[in-house]
Amino acid sequence: MTLAGKRICIAIPDTILEEHDSLRDKTIKLGQIARYCSIFGIDSVRIFHDQRGRGESRFMKKVLEYLETPQYLRKRIFPLDEELRFAGLLPPLRIPSHKAKVPLERLRPGEYREGVVLADGFSVDAGLDIPVQLGRKDAPQKRLTIKITSASKSRVDGLAVDRREIPVYWGYEVEVATGSALSGADFPLRIATSRHGDPIARVIKELRVDLRSAKGVTLLFGPPSRGLFEILGKDLRDKVSYVVNLFPEQNVVTARSEEAIFSALYLIGLLASPDLPPFT
């Protein structure tokens, strides 16, 4: 289950942290982004390269993935790492995949849990008293989404499933774009945010119609110091469906990236909602 039934991707540059020098401040900003993604049910975070960047895409991916990982799996997936020093201090996202440990007698077939394949390749640590038996061999240390098929005090069986089949929001995935920030057939409606874009009120009716019919949406954001026209080219309008200005009457020099992300996600959710009355 995603934002208003749509699959949503946000695309952010690897310069989104350029205003911050300390590890603590960078981590806090990524924590805000992770929280907004979770609140609005974002499926994918795509990190694209900005030529003026400091090469922070790997760090960004690591922190965002750490925050999305259930707490009971973090030590298995992430070894001690100085770059994650402050990530553990951030409040947990508490999304549905971040389940608490439950007694085996309360575990029911049909439940979903996140897990990591153990060294034998056939069992999975899913945060329970005993490993879940997978029924087939998979790569050790691989993270899987598991559907419990049977459970008793002595044995738990499950099978790996695609998280898209789960009827509730299950978290976001993070990728570092190797090509264009605009790639991705799953998210064909592309909306770029820019202070040089069309005021949102001017395109809101047309945007609402397109959102209703779109199966997937990509929202693109620039870094604090410059816009998407400078990063992706002056022909940006030819590459995307919309270029919108979310704050046409802003009273600050620059809206922060995380503020733009929150505002855009709220707006998209509102416009795509079937409960929103028709515009007159």
Task: State what each model feature region is.
Residues 1-280:
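Post-transcriptional modification and biogenesis factors for structured RNAs
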